Every structure is written in structure tokens, then in C-alpha cells.
Amino acid sequence: MSYTTFSKKKNNQLKEPMFFGQSVNIARYDQQKYNIFEKLIEKQLSFFWRPEEIDLSKDRIDFDNLPSNEKHIFISNLKYQTLLDSIQGRSPNIAFLPIVSIPELETWIETWSFSETIHSRSYTHIIRNIINNPSIVFDDIISNKNINDRAQDISIYYDELIRITAYWHLLGEGNHKINEKKVEINLKLLKRRLYLCLISVNVLEAIRFYVSFACSFAFAEREIMEGNAKIIRLIARDEALHLTGTQHILNILNNEKNNENMKNTVLECREEAIKIFISASEQEKKWAKYLFQDGSMLGLNKDILCQYIEYITNIRMHAIGFKMPFEKTSNPIPWINSWLNSDYIQAAPQETEISSYLVGQIESEISNQEFKNFKL
């Protein structure tokens, strides 16, 4: 199937599947097959923020006064988050847009990816405000084995989907010889690559950020590195929305009533999908041990974080129809919820530091029924 940026072939977008149908031609939003994506777009747009709005002058003083083990925790998490959002700032667009078939999902993916670029810009804003030479931090990211071991498991699923999709668009289905290697391209393989990639992205949004989030908020609970925590809170709010997006995509694919023709793919990939979750949770536990190798911090240690990883892994897997792999427990760090539930608060923006302010939240649609009790 040859990809085109604008198909002249008329089609009914309400009858197209989310993926592998006809390429989107007219980006129309008056009719939508899955209006959940429109709601996600509206929510993400209302969340718009810039890292420069947050004052980090006190954070520099706080960072200089941190003991060496806490500096290691703080900087290591920033390195890892920078890498994750560097991947997420480009990969959803490259991997998913060429195979998307409905405009609302296409626009959600573009909106999602754009917000990820704000996150990666935020880490630069934080690092250059607390360290004289940011290059010391950034140059270590690629060479740090503890970071790259985890990143590899994320990028491999994106890369495989991108590679197979490129062959499909260029050569079509069939058996091909590429660089002296035999390659079979078919829709079944493409669907498998898509589903596993979506699972991997869901795991990234669901689990991989939360060790870093917990550490940032633990610092702020002690009233230090508070500017950083305000930025991370905004990032966490966005990531929760992105997680909701991938959960909806996966649950739509899982539901036979939606005619997405993914039933067999979901069943065939189930075991591997579960392994992706379990592997990610084990990697995050390993990361927690790496962070706390030189000592714990007040209110948080590797054991508590490992319990938290199991707790959120259970919740995330259950949300997309998988069994909970770990013993069901309560949240070992319940105080984190006040940091993660910030989008429910609406505050007046007298100060630039307000981290829960939403824009574009006026309801402009009014029906005739709204005036039925009015008398003139």
C-alpha cells in the first residue's frame, strides 16, 4: 500500500478502522468515530504551559546544599526522563501517523507528541538553572549503561514498526529481498508490530516515569527543589493524559464490537504483552536500586519504591484487561496522589507558579433547553 499525504479517494471516515485503513484525507471533526480523542485533544490544549513560567532560582541553592547521594538521585532521574521524552517527542508521529485512518486519532497523536517536546525542553530548563555546565549531564546520557539498558526495550518496538511500515508502503505485501535478506510483509505482521508497540508505549507512560516522579515529589515534601517539582507535576499531569490515550486505543482494539479486526492479534500477542509489563517493572526496580545505591532520602528508599512499582503495575495492567501479576496492596506512598491529581484544581493565575491552571475551559455550547426556565 503506497502512502499519500492526501488521498483523492472519497471514503466514509466513520467506517475506517483506527489503523491500516485509507489514509486520512480531509481532517474533519464534525463527525467522529471515537470522540474520546477529541476530548483528549481539548484537555491537552487546556493544559498548555511553558517551563520558563516556573522560577528555579531557589532550586539552585537547594541543589548545592544536597548531599552527594541525593544529587545522584536528582540528576540521574533527569537524565532518564530526558531520554524518554526525547524518544516520545518524535516517535509517535513517525510510527503511528503513516498508518492512522481517522482524523481525530491523527490529531491526538500530533498533539500528544508536541506536548512531549515541552517536557524535554523542561529538563533542559531545569538542568541549566542548577548546573553551570549542562553538557556534563547531557553528554553522559547516551553512555550511561543503566539508562540505555532501559531505553533499548522502548525503542526496539518503535523501530520495528517503523521499519515494517516503510517496507509495506514502498513494496506492498508479499515476499521481498532487501539488502540480501528475505523479508515477508503482510498485514498480520504489521498488526502484531503495532499492538506490541502500543503496549510498549503504554508501559512507558504507565510505569517508567513514576520512580522519577516519586523522587521529585519527595524532595518537594521537604520544601526543597520545589520549582523542579512544580514542573514535574505539570509533566505528570500530561503523562496521565497520554496514558489515558494509549489505554483507550488498546481497549478499543480489544473490543470486538468496534470492528477493528484485531481480535486474533490481541490474543496472539497477549503473553508477550504481559512480559513487556513485567520486564518494565523489574527494570524500574533495578533503577530504584541504582538511584539509592549510596543511601536513601528522607521519606523514600528503594524498598518503598519497589513496592510502589508493583502497586502501579497492577493498576495499569488491570486497566487494559490483564490480570494483576503482583499481590494486591494499598499505595505505599499515598502522599504522592496530591501531586498527581493536580488537574482537578482550578486556581486563579495571579502568579506564574500556579501549576494547576487550565486554559480554554469555558463551555461555549448552549442549547435552547438552557433558556426554558427564563421569563421575560
Curated annotation (Swiss-Prot):
Q: Which InterPro entries match?
A: Ferritin-like_SF (IPR009078), RNR-like (IPR012348), RNR_small (IPR033909), RNR_small_AS (IPR030475), RNR_small_fam (IPR000358)
Report the domain of life of the source organism.
Answer: Bacteria
Per UniProt, Fe cation 2 binds at 116, 205, 239, 242
Ligand binding (Fe cation 1): 85, 116, 119
Its recorded reaction(s) are:
a 2'-deoxyribonucleoside 5'-diphosphate + [thioredoxin]-disulfide + H2O = a ribonucleoside 5'-diphosphate + [thioredoxin]-dithiol
Record-annotated active site? 123
* Enzyme Commission number, as recorded: 1.17.4.1
Enumerate the cofactors the protein uses.
Fe cation
Name the Gene Ontology molecular function terms of this record. Answer: metal ion binding; ribonucleoside-diphosphate reductase activity, thioredoxin disulfide as acceptor
Cofactor, how bound (note): Binds 2 iron ions per subunit.
Q: Which UniProt keywords apply?
A: Deoxyribonucleotide synthesis, Iron, Metal-binding, Oxidoreductase
One of the GO biological process terms: deoxyribonucleotide biosynthetic process
Instruction: Report the PANTHER family cross-referenced here.
Output: RIBONUCLEOSIDE-DIPHOSPHATE REDUCTASE SMALL CHAIN, RIBONUCLEOSIDE-DIPHOSPHATE REDUCTASE SUBUNIT M2
Describe the function of this protein.
Provides the precursors necessary for DNA synthesis. Catalyzes the biosynthesis of deoxyribonucleotides from the corresponding ribonucleotides.
- What family does the entry list? Belongs to the ribonucleoside diphosphate reductase small chain family.
Subunit structure, interactors included: Tetramer of two alpha and two beta subunits.
- Name the record gives this protein: Ribonucleoside-diphosphate reductase subunit beta
Natural source organism: Buchnera aphidicola subsp. Schizaphis graminum (strain Sg)
